[in-house]
Amino acid sequence: MNYINMKKIDEENKANSGDDTTESRKKQKTKNNEEHEIRSDELFRKSIFFDSHWNPNGVAPPNHRNVFYNPKTFVHRGKPIIAKLMDLDEEHLTKLISKTQK
């Protein structure tokens, strides 16, 4: 895919995305069977963009799709990883660190 095709695709995506909030809203029933609207681009704590300080609603940046955070994705599967630092043990590392801090 060349640059021109990619640019056309980007322009089409921008034209299709728009700022129409009615398309990005869904109705969801709560425990009390009350309907309320939520924006599909706001996933709150479930969003990969969620941060309690700078993005508490978990809103995706412009031109990015918001997806659910899956904690299983970031779990190491397999044998445990043992850190090897050029065959240095803790004693040798502390000596090297103390020499560099002088």
UniProtKB/Swiss-Prot annotation:
Disulfide cysteine pairs (residue numbers): none
Keywords in alphabetical order: Cytoplasm
Gene Ontology cellular component list: cytoplasm
Keyword Cytoplasm carried by entry: yes
UniProt keyword S-adenosyl-L-methionine, yes or no: no
Disordered: annotated span: 1-38
Pfam families: NpwBP (PF12622)
Predominant cellular place of this UniProt entry's protein: cytoplasm
Compartment list: Cytoplasm
Recorded family membership: Belongs to the AIM4 family.
Annotated protein name in UniProt: Altered inheritance of mitochondria protein 4
